[in-house]
Structures are given as structure tokens and as C-alpha cells.
Amino acid sequence: QLILYIKTPTGQIKKLHFTSDLGSEYNRQPFVKSKDMVSSSNFSMFEATYNELGRGFNSKKECDKEREEFIKFLKDELSKNRSVLIGVFAQARQQSMMEFLYRNFKDDPNFKYPIYIDGVLGATLNNVYLSILEGEEKEYWQEVMSWKYFHYINSYEDSMSVALRKDETKIVLSSSGMFSGGRVVNHVKTTVENKNATIVICGYQGEGTVGH
């Protein structure tokens, strides 16, 4: 969160407070620090997309259950030689999904599938994470990024090549998260035509977007 002090023309000091998405206390994301309490401010502004009633989790148990179901779903799809496309936002969602997949599959001897990370902005933000994290968190993120099953796609030509390989059993993480722009569009076009492929929507989809 951000606290900004502004001096008015009359010499008064005003305190402005901004925090990113309030989210859910049960759905903690990797590398996100515990929130600090702010006792007062002259003006506070919050994001609350994922704090809407009915959108979040009511307990840690409920959150863990959904994650377990998602892992089971991925295992079932891959065991049937299906391709899985996951639309992600380049900032935060891609990194949390990478960490989630790494944490749950790194010690699984049966997991041997390529995971393509497709998106220029997402790749840039991966390195931003690396530059701002410190200590054990920095080492862990480097470990995640270096996992042998992650394959980073840089060029548009390579992106199209992966999208057209319909018979390949794989996971693709691509942006945008609402499927309305970016390289994910090409993956969607080939995935919806493929009976052996699945599209996963894992975030808010704004009205009027393809994902919605």
C-alpha cells in the first residue's frame, strides 16, 4: 500500500492512503507482505474486485479445497493427453500461477509436461520480481523461474508455433487474462477448435470481454 503526504497551499499536511485489491485473507498470494494497519488518513482509496460478497473464500479450508480440486483437474486433463490454456494477467496472476504450479508439481515424479509462459510483459515483470525481492524470497523465485518445465516464449513466431501444436500435451500461461488481446488470442483460436484441449479462466472477467 501507499501513503502520500501532500502539503496544501495553506501549509496543511494531508495524508492520502491507497491500497491495492483487498482480496481475501484466506487466499494469500506468494511474495505479498502482511498488511500494515493504517490508523488514520484524510483520504483513503481501495481496490476491492476480489472482496465482493460471494467472490472470496469464507475459510482457509474452503480455499485449500479449491486449490486441491484445481490440481486434481490439471492432473486429470494432462493424463488424458489434453492441452490446458490458462489465461493470466501479466502482473501478479502469472507469477502466482507459476509459483502455484511449481510448488505442487516440482516433486511429482509423474509430471513431465512442458509449461509455456507466453507474453513479453509477463517475462519483463518476472525479472522485476527478481530485482525487488530479497533474501530467501529472491532465491525461491529464482528457483521457480528456473524450473525445467517452464519454457519462455519470446517471439511471435514461437508463440504461433506452440499454438498450432494441437496434439502436444502441455500447459500454456498467456495474457491477457480476459482473453481480449495479446498472444492468448491465438491460443484461444486453436484451443476452441481442439476437442482435446481445455481453457481455464482464473480471474475476474470484465463485462464486454471475450472471457466474460
Positions of PLM-derived features:
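His/Asp/Glu-rich metal-coordinating catalytic cores
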Residues: 1-109, 114
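Hard-cation-handling environments
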Residues: 70-212
